[in-house]
Regions:
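Nucleic-acid endonuclease domains
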Residues: 1-133
């Protein structure tokens, strides 16, 4: 796992996940591009990387390992509120996601499906990342 301090940009997004994905895309490519919603099986969010942040959806259902196994990403980037990007392998990401995931349920209006999401960013999460970078 590696840690990289990213440069902030004036993002157009109010949604934190989209804002951080746009910042990550800028730091990876030098271009300001819109965040998009690609399927995990297609190739990742940017240059083969899956980009995540606090409260991001990890997968539908409860099987994180099966989701990561079917994911076409070459690596994973978790970007913190302080814009530190932690780049992880599939194995590291599985360990991280398993440790800091929480099971949520969509509203009945939206079908009531379960999904795994990252918890809010915490001191424990940041310490876990720093200890492994």
């Amino acid at each position: 796992m590696t840690a990289t301090q990213y440069t902030n940009i004036n993002s157009e997004y109010k949604n934190n996940g989209q804002r951080l994905e746009q910042i990550a895309r800028f730091n990876l490519t030098g271009e300001i591009a819109k965040a998009d919603n690609r399927k995990a099986t297609e190739c990742g969010d940017c240059l083969g990387y899956q980009i995540k942040s606090a409260r991001a959806t990890i997968c539908k259902g409860e099987n994180i390992a099966a989701h990561i196994e079917s994911d076409a990403a070459i690596a994973y980037i978790y970007i913190t509120a302080e814009l530190v990007a932690y780049t992880m392998s599939k194995a590291e990401y599985l360990e991280f996601a398993t440790e800091f995931a929480t099971l949520t349920r969509e509203s009945a209006k939206n079908g009531g499906a379960t999904k795994m999401r990252f918890k809010s960013e915490s001191r424990a999460m940041l310490e876990w990342l720093k200890a492994r970078a």
